[in-house]
Regions:
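Short, charged, intrinsically disordered terminal tails
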Residues: 66-73
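Amphipathic, hydrophobic secondary-structure cores in small proteins
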Residues: 15-60
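N-terminal intrinsically disordered, cationic/polar leader segments
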Residues: 5, 9-10, 29, 51, ...
Length: 73
C-alpha cells in the first residue's frame, strides 16, 4: 500500500516516530544523527527540497532534524 509520499518523507516520518518519546530537542538531534550516518546525500537533498516546497506531510521532528542538518557543521 502506498500513501503517495516521497520515499524520503515516509522514511523520515518513520524515523521520527522512533524518537517521539524524547524531549523535542533530543529527538531532533537523534533523528539528525541517524540521517547524517545512514542517508545518502541525495536523500537529504530531496527531503530539503520537499521542505522548501512546503512539505505539508512531514513530521515536525523530521523537519526540524533536516533543518538542523542544513546548518553548517
Amino acid at each position: 500500500m502506498s500513501d503517495g509520499l516521497p520515499p524520503q518523507v515516509r522514511l523520515a516520518n518513520e524515523i521520527s516516530i522512533q524518537f517521539a518519546h524524547l524531549p523535542f530537542a533530543d529527538g531532533v538531534e537523534r533523528v539528525a544523527t541517524h540521517m547524517r550516518q545512514f542517508w545518502e546525500p541525495r536523500m537529504l537533498r530531496a527531503l530539503l527540497a520537499y521542505i522548501d516546497a512546503g512539505g505539508p506531510d512531514l513530521d515536525p521532528l523530521a523537519a526540524a532534524a533536516a533543518e538542523h542538518l542544513r546548518q553548517p557543521a
